[in-house]
Amino acid sequence: MNFENLLIELGTEELPPKALRKLAESFLANFTEELTKADLAFKSAVWYAAPRRLAINVTELAIAQADKIVEKRGPAVSSAFDAEGKPTKAAEGWARGNGITVDQAERLVTDKGEWLVYNAKVEGVETKSLIAAMAQRALDKLPIPKPMRWGSSKTQFIRPVHTATMLLGSELIEGELLGIKSARNVRGHRFMGTGFELDHADNYLTLLKEKGKVIADYESRKALIKADAEKAAAKIGGTADIEDDLLEEVTSLVEWPVVLTASFEEKFLNVPSEALVYTMKGDQKYFPVFDEAGKLLPNFIFVANIESKDPAQIIAGNEKVVRPRLADAEFFFNTDKKHTLESRLPSLETVLFQQQLGTLKDKVTRISALAAFIAEQTGANAVDAARAGLLSKTDLMTNMVMEFTDTQGTMGMHYARLDGETEAVALAMEEQYKPKFSGDTVPTAAVSCAVALADKLDTLVGIFGIGQAPKGAADPFALRRAAIGVLRIIVENKLPLDLVTLIAKAQELHGTNLSNANASDEVLEFLMARFRAWYQDKGIDVDVILAVLARRPTRPADFDSRINAVSHFRSLEASSALAAANKRVSNILAKVEGELPTAINSALLAEAAEQALAAKLAELQPQLAPLFANADYQQALTLLSSLRESVDQFFEDVMVMADDEALKNNRLALLNNLREQFLHVADISLLQ
């Protein structure tokens, strides 16, 4: 079979930068799915993307589908011929439909009878006749929330389309994509490059770079920007702050990246660096530069989309653009400093948190009380926790945060320090929102933990309390993130906190605001469900999670200890046998009517195997008790694993459901005792 390389390019107007990668990846995934469905073999496929184009390149694509034999089964032989052996109308109609005579049909014998069959050879279709339709279907399935029309066309896409190119090797594939006829012309850079005729699919990247002045390979462009930005920062003795999200966005904004260095007035460094960084990165898409000590330098790196004969002019232009934004930050900072955070408390009464749950002033009052309650249980400074909780949302009323919203918490920390608040209070102002996203760190300072937990629990209990729990994918109050945050803060800091107690206190502080009588139970169930999701994301086996969930431990740190213990137990040689034995014990005990017997009478231990098991349990129990008390579940399960031989022998030699009622009840008591030891940790009968 012959193969050729395929190139498909869609030339558009500027595509949304934050959607560019997803569009390109989806285009490729959709198209390769089409190739697979069409039984077209290929070696590999990659996507390219730049601000004004999407492209895919498929290497060693078969130029035609492989021929194949298709079995076309006809009527059963018993109904294909009459009593005289002549073909029936059914047989003749089937044969005629397949272009053969009945005599040309073969016979297929199965265990259900004998059938007429025709093995038809189906010739593969040429790839070039399939490409346009497959590419169009791939484009139709792209994730485009708001498609648009342009000109007089009824075609819809995320942005207007101007060119379409489909080449299989050197051959132009005829057809249309989004109403645009396939042609060889490829557009270059808007200002620097020239358009050209693409002669062969293999020459796309090279010609586009040389003639068009466009680096179409997204990953190459991204790597070039990162490397050049790092070099530029190093030249001025600093390190560029290159977050991947910003790097992705900048990569999606330029076709021909040129990295340049600019500066701003040093006086702006008197403003907290977070505010300056926010405007440089968020508004201007610049890379800030820091020195070795982590201090912001009066410089920034930016990426132009053109090679200028006068780069100094481009640098001056960017410096001119950023200066007013930095001046705004300076003005807001100096204005905000004139008022303490405490003085802003009354203004929180003007901001509604939620109609039924009150204002932000109501919320910080609850947070303050709950944070102090949590601090008392964890050994943190309750006075600082209460103070931090009370001030926690006051920075939302500052000019800086109103203008640069992502600086909430961070600016609160800076203003708290200027107000003379304790460092614990100031730090809690910033860390109250952690973790902000998946993979973010959690607060570790004791007061910060108390405030962060109080804020999240107040929201969880409040929203559930008014009957607005998340439904489906909708989660307007980010309750799933809040729940994971609660669990992570407690687990990762090993805090001795019980969810039931925390929920009850939060509910108490809401007073009569809550209308849902089942709120506390629903919040607990919601948090327990987050346990499963979180541990699954961490790679913990589902059966391990279910084994622990069966015991419903409501102390997250304790839950985590059990998860780790059961995961370790799974690695022991005896685990599978003991899990199976526990499952057998569970099934036996489940069939017992009435109360389970608990007292073991040593005089009724008739068989050697049951005597040995009882003796082993009696030997282990004094050792297990302190381990359970100290939540040393891993060591407890390791000790219990030594029961394997005794348990195996018991089930080999002993009939549990003996005719003698006393013997039976004694053996049930022995098994109940055995199972209870494991249940101190988890229900290991659920392990697979």
Swiss-Prot record:
Top-level taxon in the UniProt lineage: Bacteria
Q: Which GO terms describe its cellular component?
A: cytosol
Name the EC number(s).
Answer: 6.1.1.14
Principal place where this protein is found?
cytoplasm
Q: Which GO terms describe its molecular function?
A: arginine-tRNA ligase activity; ATP binding; glycine-tRNA ligase activity
The compartments listed are: Cytoplasm
Recorded hits in InterPro entries, A to Z, give: DALR_anticod-bd (IPR008909), Gly-tRNA-synth_bsu (IPR015944), Gly-tRNA-synth_heterodimer (IPR006194)
User: What's in the keyword line of the UniProt record?
Assistant: Aminoacyl-tRNA synthetase, ATP-binding, Cytoplasm, Ligase, Nucleotide-binding, Protein biosynthesis
Swiss-Prot/TrEMBL GO biological process terms? arginyl-tRNA aminoacylation; glycyl-tRNA aminoacylation
| Reaction catalysed by this enzyme | tRNA(Gly) + glycine + ATP = glycyl-tRNA(Gly) + AMP + diphosphate
Q: Which family does it belong to?
A: Belongs to the class-II aminoacyl-tRNA synthetase family.
* Subunit description: Tetramer of two alpha and two beta subunits.
This chain's protein is named Glycine--tRNA ligase beta subunit
What taxonomic lineage is listed for the species of origin?
Bacteria, Pseudomonadati, Pseudomonadota, Gammaproteobacteria, Alteromonadales
